[in-house]
Each structure stands twice: as structure tokens, then as C-alpha cells.
Amino acid sequence: MASKTAADHFNRDSFVLAIDAMGGDHAPEIVVEGMAIAAERHPDARFLLVGDETLLAPLLARWPRAASVCTVRHAPVKVTGEMKAAAALRLRDSSMRIAIDAVAHGEASGVVSAGNSGALLALAKIILKTLPGIDRPALAAIMPSARGDILMLDLGANVLCDPRNLVEFAIMGDVFARSVLGLTAPRIGLLNVGSEEQKGDDRIRTAAEMLRTSHLAQQFHGFVEGHDIAGGTTDVVVADGFSGNIALKTAEGTAKMLGGLLKQIFTSTILARLGYLLARGGLERLREWLDPRRYNGAVLVGLNGVVVKSHGGTDAQGFAHAVDVGMDMVSNRSSDRIREGIAKLVELSGAAHPARDKDGTAQLAEAR
């Protein structure tokens, strides 16, 4: 196995993603296979595969395409699913830690892991730190809707948020939607208990007012309710981590219930089975639309580097999709674009309050 750094190994025109080979329920097998699938779709991408070399060697022999586009860095320790974040922070030779360190040292532009969520979030925040002007990173993910894929954030990284946090999430969501969903002017909504302007608490109303006077004013739809998420009223739904996580888990539970009910209904009688055969084409499209693998890959946005969290129980196709998300974020310079968005917000805030300090931070701090 090559010991040189990923940055040395590949030419300057390619970008490198660090892969935590040991994270997830079925690692490292599905990780290497998923990386191989992603490599076929993205021939310019290169990988720094971090994990136990003795386990990775036979897998890379099985997937020569993956072997040809990666270097391996030995990491003998795995962060387990039951491990507390504090314990994971002490494991300096874990595959997760070394993969994130590679991003911090400039050897990789992003990291993908299917490992312990709490440990990944804690390590990423401490090692990579937030971008200038960002108070807190947010967890963002793609979800299905009646009008196509949408983006929602925060999904649980921040339970309590102030107005400025929500505005930062909107800026980061705008960049994510442009980078991954390919939208030129994503419509942005704030999740609230009603769509009327007077609804919600001071925190959510202040955030809405800040967005109406920001560079995202033309894209800001206003308040959205729970049913607007599935309806696709906006392309980006912004929420605090408490509300966002509940909305996500509710959507996942509803999708599972729907799948179970359809299976129960279409296997209940002979006529029902016949009905399934007649409706098979449409039902297969519905199954594909609801396939969680299509939406695998939540991103911790707002850090100095791209961090993608894959579902721990996914298969190779699902992990490959998480890698796809990481590649989209890196190739579209998402971190740079978030910096630009924050700079515009500060500039507009300063222009609106010229008597305050030059960078507008007094007005922004007032919103906390």
C-alpha cells in the first residue's frame, strides 16, 4: 500500500475525498464497494481510504477500479456505534479521526463517513472549526417532495438557535441547493407554526425580517408549515435542529409505514396480488422515489471542509450516493460560496446601519 500523501499521489487538477473505511454497520466491505461505484461515475475523483490495511487489501483486490483511484492510510482503531463522543475524541489513531485530520491538513477537500454520528459531528466541529462568520454548522440533507427533491436543515446539530443562526442556515442551504440540486435560485422557507407573518415567536420573526433585507430577499418565500415540506412549496426548508429532526424522523416513519401498508394490501388476497401485477410499473416508480438510498448523505455545512454523514446501515449504492454528495459539494466550492454569502450578509447589515461598526457585527450580534 502506498504511504505517500493523497495530495502527492494525484495530480493537481483532481480533488481528494477522505473515506472513513471502518465506519458503519457493514464496513469496510460496503465502503470500498460504494467507493468503487462512485469512482465509475466520477472518473476525476481521487480518494484517501483510511482504515485497517489488512482488511482493506483483499477488498481493493476485488475492486481494482477503487484501488486505482485511492491511497490507503492505515488506521487500526474503529470508532464504534456505541462510543460516546468524548471517548472518540481521545482516539487519535481512529479511522474517523485520521480522515478528518486529512481535511484539516489540506490533504483532502472533504470526508465521508458512515460511522457514529455524534462522534463525527464532535470531531468535525473541533478539528475543522467553522468558517469565518459562521456561528454554528448545520446538518443538511435532501428529502423527496411532490415537486422533486428539496433540502432541509438543520436536522439535529443545533437544538436551540437564535435568529442569526437561522439566517446562516438559509445562506448555507442556498449554496447546498445550488451545488447538489443544481438550482440557480432556490426558493427558501422558514419552518413555522403558520404561514402568516405574525405567526411564531420573536426569534423566527426576526430571522424572517433579516432574510427579507438580505441578498436572499428575492428567493425568500416566507414561512412554511409541516405540510409544505412534502408539498415542495420551497426548495430549501430552514429550521432549528429540534424541529428539523422531528420533521425528518416523521417523514422517515411515514415512508416506512406507507411501504408496509402497500405490501400488506397487495398481498392480502388473490385479487390484490393481481392488482399489484397491473399496477407494478407505477408502484416500482414509487418505490424508487421513496428509496432511502437516493437521499443518503447528510452534510455538516459551515465548516472548513466538506463533511458527509452516510447512514450507518446503508448498502454500497447508498454509500456511493453519499460520496456523490461530497463530490458535488467539493467540486462546486461550497465552502468558498458560503464565505461569500456571509460576506454579503455582513455588508448589507453594515449598509443598513452605517452608524454602527464597519463590518455590521453589532447589528448581527443584536439578533442573538
UniProtKB/Swiss-Prot annotation:
MF (Gene Ontology): phosphate:acyl-[acyl carrier protein] acyltransferase activity
Q: In which pathway does it act?
A: Lipid metabolism; phospholipid metabolism
Specify the superkingdom: Bacteria
InterPro entries associated with the record:
FA_synthesis (IPR003664), Phospholipid_synth_PlsX-like (IPR012281)
Look up the EC number in the record and give it: 2.3.1.274
Q: What is its main location?
A: cytoplasm
> What is one GO cellular-component annotation here?
cytoplasm
> Which PANTHER family does this entry report, sorted A to Z?
FATTY ACID/PHOSPHOLIPID SYNTHESIS PROTEIN PLSX, PHOSPHATE ACYLTRANSFERASE
Q: Which family is this protein grouped under?
A: Belongs to the PlsX family.
Question: Which HAMAP family does the entry link to?
Answer: PlsX
Oligomeric state and partners?
A: Homodimer. Probably interacts with PlsY.
Q: What is this protein called?
A: Phosphate acyltransferase
Species of origin reads Granulibacter bethesdensis (strain ATCC BAA-1260 / CGDNIH1)
